[in-house]
Amino acid sequence: MRELIKEIWSTSKRNKLRTSLTGFAVAWGIFMLIFLLGAGNGLINAQLQQSTRFLANSMRVFPGETSKAYKGLKEGRSITLNDKDILISNKTYGQYVDDVGGRLEQYNVNINYGDNYVASQSLVGVAPTHPKIDKTELIAGRFINEIDMKEQRKNVVLSRSQAKELSKDYRSLVGKNVKISNLNFQVVGIYKDDESRNNTEAFIAYSTIKTIYAKGDDAGSLEFTIKNLKTKEDNEKFEKNYRASI
């Protein structure tokens, strides 16, 4: 064993450059292995976190484009969702869906409180059922409710990140007024967000955003929970019929 060590040491002294390069290659390989393992675990954790964010039996429907030509109309036409689609979801598919609501967004709005502000935020109009679907956790105040919807109240629910930018004592913002697009909104709640991400969503009533920003019958996207679909075949049939009806 001693002779082997002497031989290795002697060879290393005679070939210093090759020894150095070999050592560097081994060290670099170990570093890359650790880095890739860490990145892989990070991606897995991010995917798990994203998949658990939404209720398991929830569904979100987005507008898109047509994939086929129809009666002289070309493919690639824009598909928009409107209030009629909310009614169809409730009436035609009532035995399969619950908590149907629209989700409308107004981008690049500023939120001001005194001399403090947060820029380029997204104002999102949702139904009171949204926290159930999106698993929104409130840390102060309340979420949008049915009275806000019915009376089109200018009430807003801020993220914790937004509230912290506006006030050091961010919980004290509940009950205070902030300005959004030069309109006064009362803060009724603050929700917990993932501060490692860029959280820019502030929630108001779906009916309010439609009125203030003249959205007409545009529904943006739809979100709802699903029930009474027990097999894969049931789910595939529902998806096919639902897509065809809207």
Q: Can you describe what each PLM-predicted range is?
A:
Residues 7, 45, 83-88, 237-240, ...:
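Generic recognition of well-ordered alpha-helical segments
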Residues 29-40:
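Alpha-helical transmembrane segments
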Residues 41-108:
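Membrane-proximal extracellular/periplasmic loop immediately following the first transmembrane helix
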Residues 95, 121, 185-189:
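Small-residue-enriched segments and motifs
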Residues 129-143, 154-246:
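Mid-to-C-terminal secondary-structure elements
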